Amino acid sequence: MRPHAVHALIAVKRLDQAKSRLADRLRPEHRARLVLAMLADTMTATTSVPGIAAVTVVTPDAAVADLARSLGGHVHPEPAADSADSLNAALAAAAAGVRARHGGVDLLALQADLPALRPDELADVLATAPRGGRAIVTDHAGTGTAALLVRDGGELAPAFGPDSARRHIAAGAVDLPGEWPGLRRDVDTAADLERAVELGAGSSTRALLRDIGWSCRVHEPARRVC
């Protein structure tokens, strides 16, 4: 892999612990399928960007790992502990492994739940970000981090979790100002999912939502959705 190629890293929790804030709208098995569908759309968009050479998915979940490999991704096993600290440690370890194998490649840590992500958004991020140093794209709320890009050969040093944008900026990351609605729209709630659909969710997420009958407005009761 050539220096300054970008290697993307995507962390995914165990499926039985994912998307708990959608529990009032979706049964556990539907939430698990949604996580996989959104990951598929996120990976498909990411691997379509010419400047991104490879994707590694960091996960303790076998089903997630199988999907990642089927889409051409690499897998770094994350310890099963479910916390922001364990996720950040696993991302950092995966990033160090990438650098050990491929030298001074650029690193891009992405959220896994970006079903409306478009390749041109990521391409614009890579074109807009400073050639050296660190940069982030905040999420739609302005407090989380949708993407963390490291181009200075330094450690990834991820700080995902509550208020991660502030922590990444305090550590020297530039807050990129582009619009990029699909990149900024991670999905934690029913309202987030509806907005992602409005923006144009990818084919895997659309197919899953049709299959499980996600057709009601956000404020309507769960019994009419599932």
Curated annotation (Swiss-Prot):
Reaction equation(s) it catalyzes: phosphoenolpyruvate + GTP + H(+) = enolpyruvoyl-2-diphospho-5'-guanosine + diphosphate
GO biological process: F420-0 metabolic process
Keywords of this entry: GTP-binding, Nucleotide-binding, Nucleotidyltransferase, Transferase
Pathway connected to this protein: Cofactor biosynthesis; coenzyme F420 biosynthesis
Record Pfam families: CofC
Binding sites annotated in the UniProt record for phosphoenolpyruvate: T145, G161, S164
Listed InterPro entries: CofC, Nucleotide-diphossugar_trans
Enzyme Commission number(s): 2.7.7.105
Enzyme category, top tier: transferase
A molecular function GO annotation: phospholactate guanylyltransferase activity
Role according to the record: Guanylyltransferase that catalyzes the activation of phosphoenolpyruvate (PEP) as enolpyruvoyl-2-diphospho-5'-guanosine, via the condensation of PEP with GTP. It is involved in the biosynthesis of coenzyme F420, a hydride carrier cofactor.
Family: Belongs to the CofC family.
Designated name of the protein: Phosphoenolpyruvate guanylyltransferase
Species of origin: Nocardia farcinica (strain IFM 10152)
Species lineage: Bacteria, Bacillati, Actinomycetota, Actinomycetes, Mycobacteriales
